Amino acid sequence: PLRLMMKLGAVPDAFTWHVESFYRTNFPKGKGFTQAASEVPAAPGDLPEAAVEAFSVDDSSTTEIDDAASVTHLDGGRSRIGIHIATPALIMPRGSVADESARSRMSTVYAPGMKTTMLPESWIERTSLDEGKCVPCVSLYVTVDDETMAVQSTETRVEKITVKHNLRYDLIHEEVTPEAIENGTLTVPCAHEIGFLWRFAKARLAEREERRGRPEQTGRIDWYLELEGEGENLRIIRKGR
């Protein structure tokens, strides 16, 4: 039937048929949002603003910046690592049109060459952790020893942060290497913080391997796909780990 419809001109190509079939099945009311779902309430005015210099790392195509990290050095040879998560739910009334819409979608749909967001653009603009914006978030703080990287304490806060940098993975991944971190030659923004988090991640890896009794599997490969046009141009890019 598909080949017949394409031959008769009812369907331009197989790509269009598959995409439209997916959306008819999963978005029977359409991909758009109602005006009511797009209305964004004001954020609470009494949230404290954290004194951190946070940064995010995403691909250049990412418009919903939903997480960021920070490293703040304390006295006594300690540092505080912050993991900051965007929190549109903080200002989204339970049972509202926006809430019901988000619950029905559950997630943003990602596919090569297309993306259908879980939230309306107005919500993304208000709550995304964009560079230079002061926005609400949920922060997990981990205080660690600078030398041993041992975790000393943890804390969770609801607050506001201003993200200093939105780093783009595809623009810096060739520069961010273990050798550059170890040699102190990394020159990308937040190089010191990236190096500190790398050391922290290595310490956690060593802990996991000790408990497991065997090395963690490495060498796994990630792929990044870029689709141009109507599916005729596909770039497959190997991502480092």
Q: What positions do the PLM features span?
A:
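Electropositive polyanion-binding surfaces
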Residues: 33-241
